[in-house]
Amino acid sequence: MKQPEQLDARSCVLLRLGERRFALAAEHIAELVAPSRVYRFAHRTPEIDGVILRRGRVVPVCDVAEKLTGKKLTYRRFYLVATRRREGNTDWVALPVSGECELITADLTPAGESDSPHVAAWLSHDGEVIEVLNLDALTPGAKLAQPGMPEAHA
């Protein structure tokens, strides 16, 4: 059996969603902010709870806890604002977290073929094996129009 190769040590941010901890690569973190007003409006993207205004940007709030733990967060302590690359552009997404966040340096083990698409890698910290998240697989992006769906034209 082939052993997965170890990557170099990388900085990651540990975040708590309910009872579980997950990680994001530190280079994807823009900032950690206190909960603020979430603006809700009619839309067709169930993964988006609403938006927050941050540094002159409209940032979608995506509660990924339900996908990862099976439960929506009932308590939001912070929003972890992260960056992601979509279609050549960098945009922000706010992830509600229920506990403290911690910056660590850890050796990452690449995700295997049998791992879920939301797992970018694995790390070990304080005796716990933690999933390093792939935001592109967890958060909604621009989707092509469905056949039969109306499209807006200028």
Where are these regions (language model features)?
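An acidic, low-aromatic, low-complexity terminal/linker signal
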Residues: 1-154
